[in-house]
Amino acid sequence: MPWAAGRRWAWITLILTIIAVLIQAAWLWLGTQNFVFSREEIAQLARQYAGLDHELAFSRLIVELRRLHPGHVLPDEELQWVFVNAGGWMGAMCILHASLSEYVLLFGTALGSHGHSGRYWAEISDTIISGTFHQWKEGTTKSEVFYPGETVVHGPGEATALEWGPNTWMVEYGRGVIPSTLFFALADTFFSTQDYLTLFYTLRAYARGLRLELTTYLFGQDS
């Protein structure tokens, strides 16, 4: 019936309007934030260690980040490598810093993997320490290959196909509405792997980052 179709379109219009308002509010909120890190800083630091054994590179990077940003990098006893299954790929991450608007983490795969990048309300950049990163952007017919020392940037709302070779490791920086990225990162837990222990590890790592930021904000860097 015409009235039913009109009502359905009214609901669709309302939902799209709400989504548009939420997106605008999110970006206005981001515009008021004082960020701790920058994409350029993380990329420059990671490039210094590109080509090294990834474990050595990561340990040196962590020391340098703590020196430059005291009170914003998790202590060694709270660092944990956690599996990530999302978009058809599998990797592992270690969160160094996390807030509502930023994160810094170590990421990679020992075996190689490929899948969908996801779409985010955030900009994500990866600077490669070892291995290869293949990216096929939406709307194109050719892929690109990135090597150690190079940075791959994934803009807000973008989607790509990606593939990592065996023993590919990188440093990742994200800026945007960070809680929104968890929906993609955790979806496979509910609909595929049902690995709820990894879900717990992931949420605990993010909660630790939020707690550290709150503690530093309230009591200063030496708390």
Curated annotation (Swiss-Prot):
Residues 31-223 are cytoplasmic. Pfam families: ERG2_Sigma1R (PF04622). It comes from Mus musculus (Mouse). Widely expressed with higher expression in liver, brain, kidney and thymus. Expressed throughout the brain with higher expression within cerebral cortex, hippocampus and cerebellum. Within the hippocampus expressed in cornu ammonis pyramidal neurons, the granular cells of the dentate gyrus as well as interneurons. Within the cerebellum, expressed in Purkinje cell bodies. Highly expressed in the brainstem and motor neurons of the spinal cord. Expressed by neural retina, retinal pigment epithelial cells and lens. Residues 1-9 are lumenal. Its main location: nucleus. Functions in lipid transport from the endoplasmic reticulum and is involved in a wide array of cellular functions probably through regulation of the biogenesis of lipid microdomains at the plasma membrane. Involved in the regulation of different receptors it plays a role in BDNF signaling and EGF signaling. Also regulates ion channels like the potassium channel and could modulate neurotransmitter release. Plays a role in calcium signaling through modulation together with ANK2 of the ITP3R-dependent calcium efflux at the endoplasmic reticulum. The record marks 126, 172 as: Important for ligand binding. This is Sigma non-opioid intracellular receptor 1. The chain crosses the membrane at residues 10-30. It is a single-pass membrane protein. It is found in: Nucleus inner membrane; Nucleus outer membrane; Nucleus envelope; Cytoplasmic vesicle. Signal peptide: none annotated. Depletion by RNAi enhances kappa-type opioid receptor-mediated analgesia and prevents the memory-improving effects of (-)- and (+)-pentazocine. Residues 2-8 are annotated as: Targeting to endoplasmic reticulum-associated lipid droplets. One of its GO terms (cellular component) is glutamatergic synapse. One of its GO terms (molecular function) is signaling receptor activity. Keywords: Cell junction, Cell membrane, Cell projection, Cytoplasmic vesicle, Endoplasmic reticulum, Lipid droplet, Lipid transport, Membrane, Nucleus, Postsynaptic cell membrane, Receptor, Synapse, Transmembrane, Transmembrane helix, Transport. The C-terminal helices form a flat, hydrophobic surface that is probably tightly associated with the cytosolic surface of the endoplasmic reticulum membrane.
